[in-house]
Amino acid sequence: MLTIELNEDGDVVEIHGDTHGLASLRDIIERLLESPEQIDHAHLMTPAWGGNELSEDVQRESNSLVHHVKLHFWGGA
């Protein structure tokens, strides 16, 4: 499970994950780091948005679910 939410005020991003979900996020980040010449970004989406990387199960009732996250790799140190 990997769920990304915005708090009630919309100024804090919360990442909720179990072992599998956080390991999947780590793997996506590692792919970006290992192949920057081939991959400079990655999409994480809920099933409602055509993906399977993010869960649609809100973990805090007052939060808003994020359906699409785009990770960008800009290289460098």
What is the meaning of each model-derived region?
Residues 1-77:
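Positively charged, low-complexity terminal tracts
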